[in-house]
């Protein structure tokens, strides 16, 4: 396995660990999720370019579009939660609290 793939995989694992460990604030969760999407995008792009998949040339662009949509929804949720509650804690997202 080349060093490039190992580095990208480690970036994905570090982002995943950050998502699992620092999940109290919504902003840190969104940043870790963006890091995961960026590492997936780079891994998919390198794989498509190295293996010359002609049918999968659009896959990195489609993944990038989904990442942009996810970022827009996440930031709108962050603005809504911070305007409503004053903080960006993830525990404020639970609407079933009694």
Curated annotation (Swiss-Prot):
EC numbers, comma separated: 7.1.1.2
Topology of the protein relative to the lipid bilayer: Multi-pass membrane protein
Gene3D superfamilies hit by this protein: 1.10.287.3510
Catalysed reactions, as listed in the record: a ubiquinone + NADH + 5 H(+)(in) = a ubiquinol + NAD(+) + 4 H(+)(out)
Keywords, in A-Z order: Electron transport, Membrane, Mitochondrion, Mitochondrion inner membrane, NAD, Respiratory chain, Translocase, Transmembrane, Transmembrane helix, Transport, Ubiquinone
Disulfide cross-links: none
Domain of life per record: Eukaryota
Residue ranges crossing the lipid bilayer per the database entry: 1-21, 29-49, 61-81
Keyword NADP carried by entry: no
A single GO cellular-component term on record: respiratory chain complex I
Matching InterPro entries: NADH_UbQ_OxRdtase_chain4L/K, NUOK/Mnh_C1-like
Signal peptide: none
An individual GO BP term: ATP synthesis coupled electron transport
Molecular function terms from GO: NADH dehydrogenase (ubiquinone) activity
Cell location: Mitochondrion inner membrane
Subunit structure, interactors included: Core subunit of respiratory chain NADH dehydrogenase (Complex I) which is composed of 45 different subunits.
Stated family: Belongs to the complex I subunit 4L family.
Purpose of the protein: Core subunit of the mitochondrial membrane respiratory chain NADH dehydrogenase (Complex I) which catalyzes electron transfer from NADH through the respiratory chain, using ubiquinone as an electron acceptor. Part of the enzyme membrane arm which is embedded in the lipid bilayer and involved in proton translocation.
Stated name of the protein: NADH-ubiquinone oxidoreductase chain 4L
């Amino acid at each position: 396995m080349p060093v490039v793939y190992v580095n990208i995989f480690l970036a994905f694992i570090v982002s995943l660990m950050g998502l699992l460990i620092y999940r109290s604030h919504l902003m840190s969760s969104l940043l870790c999720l963006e890091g995961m999407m960026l590492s997936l995008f780079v891994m998919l792009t390198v794989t498509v370019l190295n293996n010359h998949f002609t049918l999968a040339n659009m896959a990195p662009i489609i993944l990038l579009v989904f990442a942009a949509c996810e970022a827009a929804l996440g930031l709108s949720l962050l603005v809504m939660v911070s305007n409503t509650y004053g903080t960006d804690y993830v525990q404020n997202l639970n609407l079933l609290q009694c």
